[in-house]
Amino acid sequence: MFWNYRIFLLMAVGVTLFFTACSEDDAPEVHGASIKLNVKLAKEFEKAKNQKVAVTLRNTSTREETVVETTLNKDTVLANLPVDMYDVIAAYTLSTEEIKALTGREADGDIAFSAAATGIQLSPGKETGIDLELTAGGTDDFVFKTIYYAGSDNKKAAGEDDCFIEIYNNTNRTLYADSLCIALTTMNRYGLRNNGKWHEYAQPQKFYFTPKGTYDWSKAEGMADPEGANDKYVYGNIVLMVPGNGKTYPIKPGQSFIIAPFALNFKEPYTTVNGKEVKPEWPDSTLNLSNAEFDVVYPGNEELDNKNADNMVILHKGNNRYMRLSRNGKEGYVLFRHPNPSQLPLYLRPYRDMKYADPSQFMQIPVAGIIDAVEVINPNADGYVSPKAFPKQLDASYAYSKPDYSFRCISRKVSRVNEGRRILQDLNNSALDFVQMIPNPKAFAPSK
C-alpha cells in the first residue's frame, strides 16, 4: 500500500511538472471537484457511541458507487472527485441497547436511519456543500415488495405485457387489503440542469414549473388548493383500488398479493390487447402470472380477463388502453387509503396556454393518506436525473432497474427474519431499500 502511494505521488508530481512546462496555448487545466458534507442526527440520539455514518456517492453517469465514512455533525471534505452528477446517500444504525441507553425506551430491533441528496451536479474547481439530516424509516402497514416495470424482450418474450406489482404485509398482524388504493403517479421528466439552464427537452414555454423543475400544480386550471398543490399532494395517472367489503382479502403477516395488468401465463402462447397472437421464443425469460391475485381489466379487454384473478376497481384509468407501467422508469408508485377515493379531483397538467393542453387528467392524492411510496427514476444515458416529484418524507431518493425490456425489476431488501417472518427494509429511502433482480413473483430479494 505504501509503495503504491509513493508511485502514485511520483506520477502526480511528474504530471504536474509536465503541464507546468507546457505553454498556456496547450489544453486547458482541468480541476477536480469536491463536496463538503455534514450529516446530522436528531438531538435525542446525537450522543450515541456510534458516531460513524456510511455515505455512498453514486455517479449517475457511470453508475459507479464509492462508500466513504464520515462523523456525525462534523464537516467532511471529499476532494478530487470527477466532475459529474451524483446522488449522495447516508445510512446509519442504532442498536437496541443504545436506543434504550439514550431514550429509556425499549425497541423491537435496531433502528435504521437514512438521508439523501439526489442529482447533485459538481463543478470544476468548486466545493459543493451538502447537509443531510438522518431520519428513521419504517411503515407498520403494507409496503411495495416488488415493482417490475421494465418488461421482457419485446420480440422473443412478452414485452410490456408481463409486468406486475407485489404488495407485502410488513407487520406482525393480519391486514385487510380491501379498499387499499394504488396509484402510478406522473412526473416532469426534463427540468433544470444544475447550471440553472433548462434541459434541452424541457418545455418551459408550455408548462409552469417550480424552481426545482417539477410541475407547478398550483397553476393547474381550476386548482382548489393552490397553496398546498405542490407539497400536500401527488398526482396519479392510473389509480386503482382493491375491491371487497372490508374483510374480503385478509393478508397474513409476511404474506403478499400481486396485481398484474394481465394475469396470464406468458410462457405459453397468448393474445395481446391488439389481438396479436404471441408465441414466446424465450419462455424462460418471461413469467407465468396466471396465479396473480388481481388483474386490471380495462373496458374492451374483457377477453383477457383471468376469471381466477379478482378485478381491481379502476378509479382513474389514465390515457392508455391498459394498465401500462413506465418501462423506461420515470414514474412514482404510492399505496394510500382514502374514505372516498372515487371523488378525488382530477386536473390537467399546468399549461401556460390551454390551447396546448391534451386531455390527460391526473388524480390529486393527499400525501396525508399515503402509507408507502417508491419513486422510480432511471438516469438518462448522460447521467441526467429527472427532478423528484415526491416530497422527501415520502421517499428520500429513488430506485431503478435496468429499463426497456431488460427482464429486471426492483425488489425490497429483507431487513431481518423474526420467527420465520421476513421483515422488509423500509427506510423511506428507495436507493437503500431496493435492489435490482430478475423478476420472480413471491420471491424475496437475495441476501447480502
Regions found by a protein language model. Give the residues of each.
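Bacterial N-terminal signal peptides that target proteins for export
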Residues: 1-9
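C-terminal motif of bacterial Sec signal peptides marking the signal peptidase cleavage site
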Residues: 18-21
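Intrinsically disordered, low-complexity linkers and terminal tails enriched in Ser/Thr/Pro/Gly
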Residues: 23-32, 38-52, 56-67, 71-74, ...
